[in-house]
Amino acid sequence: MSNLKWRALLVVVVLIVGVVYLVPTFVSTLPPGWSKFLPKDKIRLGLDLQGGMHLILEVEADQAVSNTATRLAEDLKDAFRKEKIAFNKIDKTGKWDIEVQLPGTEQQSQIGPLVEKEFPTLKWVSAETQPEGTVKVMLTVHEKEVERVQKAAIAQGLETIRNRIDQFGVSEPDIRPQGEDRILVQLPGIQDPQRAVELIGKTAQLEFKLVAEGVSPQDVKSGKAPAGTKIYPMKHTDRTTRQRTESQIVLNDRTLMSGEYITNAQVEIDRQHSSSYVALDFDAQGAKLFEKITEANVKKQLAIVLDGVVYSAPVIQETIGGGKATITGSFTDQEARDLAIVLRAGALPAPVKILEQRTVGPSLGADSINKGVLASIVGGIGTILFMLIYYRFGGVVADLALALNVLLVLAGMAAFGFTLTLPGIAGIALTIGMAVDANVLIYERIREELRLGKTPRAALETGYDRATLTILDANVTTIIAALVLLQFGTGPVRGFAVTLTVGLAANMFTAIFVTRVIFDYLLVQRRIKTLSI
């Protein structure tokens, strides 16, 4: 008796907990104070059910290593100048190699200890004396550093994309790594997919570079920039007509400052010209660096470069303190807002490439829900009627367990934050089928024992004992297969695997435990003499 009461109490508690987790999903207005102490998360619907956009992005992590090699080449130049080591040139070559050209062998003996001490992430590859007496030294980024930078690029890319989407205002986005260098992004209910793609994919590499001096217009037209400089496109906007044009400008290769010091970026309005611009705030370190840069380059042009395009190149009139700067250019209000978002969220450490893009309209999602629900209802009614007709009162017990099974599956989806997709509904339907199969196994075993002349209680115990192992074996092996799909599958496959896993776990509880509690109550508490199975 005591054991039966505890088992019955457990069933009631599980039922109440399941209902509590489903209340936010099916009740539009929660009671006052509910959210303070009780669950408030609804069942999340996948893109195929509510519409939205599905993206698979590939982080070009090799480019992050290449950028690291470029920075190391610039740092080498600074270190050589500081140590007064003469060099002809230092350039990044290939993917992440650095070529150092020295006037002679004397400098070669000097740079070995310097590289080993101050640049542990670089590895010495070779040193060759050229016919004219110069020495070419080849360095490369160390393998461990390559691996570290690649992993960091993917992790930072994931976090940066998540920050951008959070500021974009999409509710319940799904952003997670997939494989070694890919990121899965699902944006349910998004209204402007194209804008989202641009926002996610913008690298947002902000750089401050000096405009090269003494470069003739002929050099720019010919596309030949002097050594140590590079030609960049520059955007212009006519203040009166708002017409956009593009020209070219030559900048020094060296980046004086990047966007890593930005703490805030917000859109401001230029009242005089009725145009939008982006105001930047730097952290303490960035403020000092920007002040130092402007102090050392008064009367020179400082170009503001975003993703390889120059937006403005004002002349520095005086030292600029206070840690503030502005980006003006050919911005619409929306472009300025999006630029502020990506600058606040931080630059992507490497470009991202869209490998897969799918968009599902909300009307198609609603149609999928209606068809999925209709199919489930029709299948459920057919199953319920069959169990009632074939197993009579036993069918009633099985149908109650079936209803609890579905309730627990949906409650589990809400409790663990899983996303319900159209294949997920198929997984629930399969779960219902396996739940019925479990009850059929138990009932047929009980029928066999009753035919042998056993009492209802003895037949019940033997039937459950013999069927339980078979049911556990079938469900556990299927759960293992579902977990494999969950681990290695993508998109629809994962949605199917999630509901199947949760459903099978609920199935074992309802088919083996709940129905047994009901029959034990009837046989022990109500003392019935026959079983209607």
Curated annotation (Swiss-Prot):
Pfam families to which the protein is assigned, alphabetical:
SecD_1st (PF21760), SecD_SecF_C (PF02355), SecDF_P1_head (PF22599)
Q: Which GO terms describe its cellular component?
A: plasma membrane
Name the Gene Ontology molecular function terms of this record. Answer: protein-transporting ATPase activity
Please give the SUPFAM superfamilies that the UniProt record associates with this protein.
Multidrug efflux transporter AcrB transmembrane domain
Q: Does the keyword Isomerase apply?
A: no
Chief subcellular location equals: membrane
Membrane topology for this entry?
Answer: Multi-pass membrane protein
Q: Which UniProt keywords apply?
A: Cell inner membrane, Cell membrane, Membrane, Protein transport, Translocation, Transmembrane, Transmembrane helix, Transport
Q: Name one GO biological process term.
A: protein transport by the Sec complex
Answer yes or no on keyword Transcription regulation: no
Q: How does it assemble?
A: Forms a complex with SecF. Part of the essential Sec protein translocation apparatus which comprises SecA, SecYEG and auxiliary proteins SecDF-YajC and YidC.
Write out the function statement from the record. Part of the Sec protein translocase complex. Interacts with the SecYEG preprotein conducting channel. SecDF uses the proton motive force (PMF) to complete protein translocation after the ATP-dependent function of SecA.
Looking up PANTHER family in the UniProt record yields: PROTEIN TRANSLOCASE SUBUNIT SECD (PTHR30081:SF1), PROTEIN-EXPORT MEMBRANE PROTEIN SEC (PTHR30081)
Similarity field: Belongs to the SecD/SecF family. SecD subfamily.
Q: What is this protein's record name?
A: Protein translocase subunit SecD
